[in-house]
Amino acid sequence: MKNHRLRAFTLTDLLVLVACLSVLGTLLVTQFSRMRANSRRTTCAGNLARVSRAILDYANDHRQSLPAGDPSDHRDIWWWYKEMVKSYAGLRGESSAQDTLFACPEDRGYSSPTPFHRNPHFDYSSYVFNGVTLPGMPNISGLPLAAVKRPERTLLVMEWTAHAPLSWHESRTGRQNAPFYSDAKSVVGFVDGHVSFTPIYFDGYNAAYTQDPINGYDYQYSAK
């Protein structure tokens, strides 16, 4: 009887130990995942800061004006801007998936599962210039820097998710790119050079890039 009680106690003790180790393992995995996500977001923000600097350096060399599209060119300036500014970031030659400066590690693409930074159609870049020149769209393409009235609020370049909005870093949709939702956070760069992790407004109908947000947000697409 005595030996039986000892064996029962040992089994219970073992089960408690296993449960504790399981909880500890879950906590460690969660902490590791959080640290990994923060590290990848930091990489994204660092890359975007350098891309922002390249755009502003381009403007300094071009009569203080931001990149503008060529009406005769079918390639849209909001992603083809990279060809105009990449030399200011130290890149030479043709764009490729090896251009890590223009790659956010969390980029999951949109209509295609291929990340933007691996997609030649988007010139191998996770970051989109605030230059959507479709009719009626607020943008800063081709503007003199002096025409941007609030550079600390006006977007310069951003993760593609800011167009939706969605989020690569704190996603409520997992790996899916639908539905859009308000306050999805994206890493964005501003005309004054600073970068932030910013909630993006969604009115429930129109893509975020089609309008400035309502009051309470710290960014805008227009130069006014």
What does each model-identified segment do?
Residues 6-46:
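Amphipathic alpha-helical segments typified by the pilin-like N-terminal helix
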Residues 1-4:
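N-terminal secretory signal peptides that target proteins for export/translocation
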Residues 42-224:
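Short, well-structured segments within or immediately adjacent to enzyme catalytic domains
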